[in-house]
């Protein structure tokens, strides 16, 4: 039997750049680690959980680790000069439409380069063929955030997600092997101070598109039992009486952390702290994470097949309560003993609403804390004449990544019937008239939309938008990848 390797606190991988030798070493504290650093040496945190020690040391490639280290050093220096301000870093490292994403490389054979420019990149993992990395850029209030989605095989029960931090370095690659033989939790340098207990994993349900927009993941036991939610920026983890803390390098203080165990999860942020931490330009949309969640009965979490929308009582108007009553939406109050300021609304019941009802739902509940919408849509909901899909489409078009059209539709599907929206757009001649391929695409799957746009000839020129001829100038601008023309046509469509 292979020897089971369990990581210890402050156990690091030591890389000697001169010899290329890789060893494991432990320190009693970060201060001891820093004091021992010498030129030409790298220590990076061995925050990886696996059941068998790999036979080959290739996953700890010296070249790969050194590249990660240099990127970490660059980010650290910029961060120190900017005194923790994230914007100078994003401007330097994540220019619109281009950039380099560096993967931590554990169980991944190669770096991901120029992913944002190409839009997709093929890679291969040791044990699971994870397919194509789909890269999407989000820029809520000027802060760049990229998500890389790794779809598992069709028979997999969950998907793996790699998430870059705000500085463009992938911090997490979370893989849940459906066979439950191995669990990989590779994380790059200094991402975790304390380990997570081996019997727990962080998983992302493929049916749950919320995890992407929230930048949070449901936390499961290996047997599939739901424990709670895990935030990416800061998390206090308490398991079997042991407390650990996962943190984002920007927010080193424990001012914002979701705490959870098998009975409850809650946010440790007071309103005063939230206003201090999230004030502009540091502000991250409340949609990016669940905030101000107080103690919640475990019975709300046991049914893993159904998700709940949590709403603060103070945000619920009489008009919204009436809407829920008229449309059989049951607002479930938390245990009165806990005096929770939240109520729960079943996501399944929301999904059963018609397109018209969903739009009315969002219009009535016009609050920034609605957790299942993207930050872009939450920020610009109903403010654009394009309505609903317009703001996100403009953002996607500006980045020149047109697979985002499908991604956007997937993300807002819990709110809006995309077929109904596009049919309405066709009626108003915004996305084409007549029996166009787009109409045929509407009848098919989401991917048909991308096939439709990509099928247009790249040699076609942008025509006058008043002369549609069955296709709008937006379609042509999309086909030739002209971002300025796309934005111009989207703005025209909104008039």
Swiss-Prot record:
<dbReference type="InterPro" id="IPR036770">
    <property type="entry name" value="Ankyrin_rpt-contain_sf"/>
</dbReference>
<keyword id="KW-1003">Cell membrane</keyword>
<dbReference type="GO" id="GO:0005886">
    <property type="term" value="C:plasma membrane"/>
</dbReference>
<protein>
    <recommendedName>
        <fullName>Surface E' protein</fullName>
    </recommendedName>
</protein>
<keyword id="KW-0812">Transmembrane</keyword>
<feature type="transmembrane region" description="Helical">
    <location>
        <begin position="224"/>
        <end position="235"/>
    </location>
</feature>
<keyword id="KW-0472">Membrane</keyword>
<keyword id="KW-1133">Transmembrane helix</keyword>
<keyword id="KW-0614">Plasmid</keyword>
């Amino acid at each position: 039997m292979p020897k089971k390797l369990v990581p210890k606190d402050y156990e690091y991988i030591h890389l000697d750049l001169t010899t290329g030798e890789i060893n494991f070493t432990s320190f009693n504290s970060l201060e001891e680690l820093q004091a021992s650093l010498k030129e030409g040496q790298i220590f990076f945190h061995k925050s990886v959980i696996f059941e068998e020690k790999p036979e080959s040391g290739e996953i700890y490639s010296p070249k790969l680790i050194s590249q990660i280290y240099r990127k970490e050093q660059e980010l650290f220096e910029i961060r120190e000069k900017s005194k923790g301000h994230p914007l100078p870093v994003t401007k330097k490292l994540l220019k619109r439409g281009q950039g380099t994403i560096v993967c931590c490389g554990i169980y991944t054979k190669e770096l991901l380069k120029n992913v944002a420019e190409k839009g997709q990149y093929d890679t291969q993992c040791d044990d699971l063929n994870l397919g194509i990395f789909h890269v999407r850029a989000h820029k809520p209030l000027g802060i760049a955030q990229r998500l890389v989605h790794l779809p598992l095989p069709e028979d997999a029960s969950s998907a793996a997600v790699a998430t870059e931090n705000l500085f463009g370095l992938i911090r997490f690659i979370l893989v849940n092997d459906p066979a439950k033989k191995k669990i990989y939790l590779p994380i790059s340098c200094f991402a975790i101070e304390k380990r997570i207990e081996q019997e727990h994993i962080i998983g992302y349900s493929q049916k749950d598109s919320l995890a992407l927009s929230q930048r949070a993941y449901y936390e499961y036991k290996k047997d599939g039992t739901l424990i709670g939610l895990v935030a990416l920026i800061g998390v206090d983890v308490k398991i079997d009486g042991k407390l650990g803390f996962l943190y984002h390098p920007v927010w080193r203080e424990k001012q914002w952390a979701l705490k959870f165990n098998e009975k409850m999860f809650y946010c440790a942020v007071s309103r005063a702290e939230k206003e201090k931490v999230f004030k502009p330009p540091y502000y991250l949309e409340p949609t990016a994470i669940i905030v101000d969640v107080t103690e919640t009965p475990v019975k709300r979490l046991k049914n893993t097949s159904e998700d709940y929308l949590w709403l603060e009582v103070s945000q619920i108007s009489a008009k919204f309560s009436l809407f829920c009553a008229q449309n059989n939406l049951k607002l479930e109050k938390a245990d009165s003993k806990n005096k929770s300021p939240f109520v729960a609304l079943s996501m399944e019941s929301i999904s059963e609403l018609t397109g018209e009802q969903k739009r009315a739902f969002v219009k009535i509940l016009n609050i920034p804390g609605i957790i299942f919408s993207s930050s872009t849509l939450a920020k610009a909901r109903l403010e654009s004449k394009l309505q609903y899909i317009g703001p996100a489409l403009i953002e996607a078009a500006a980045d020149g990544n047109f697979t985002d059209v499908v991604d956007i539709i997937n993300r807002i599907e819990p709110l809006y019937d995309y077929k109904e929206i596009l049919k309405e757009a066709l009626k108003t001649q915004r996305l084409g008239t007549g029996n166009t391929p787009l109409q045929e695409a509407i009848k098919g799957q989401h991917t048909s939309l991308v096939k439709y746009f990509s099928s247009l000839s790249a040699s076609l020129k942008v025509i006058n938008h008043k002369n549609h001829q069955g296709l709008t100038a937006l379609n042509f601008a999309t086909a030739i990848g002209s971002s300025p023309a796309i934005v111009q046509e989207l703005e025209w469509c909104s008039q």
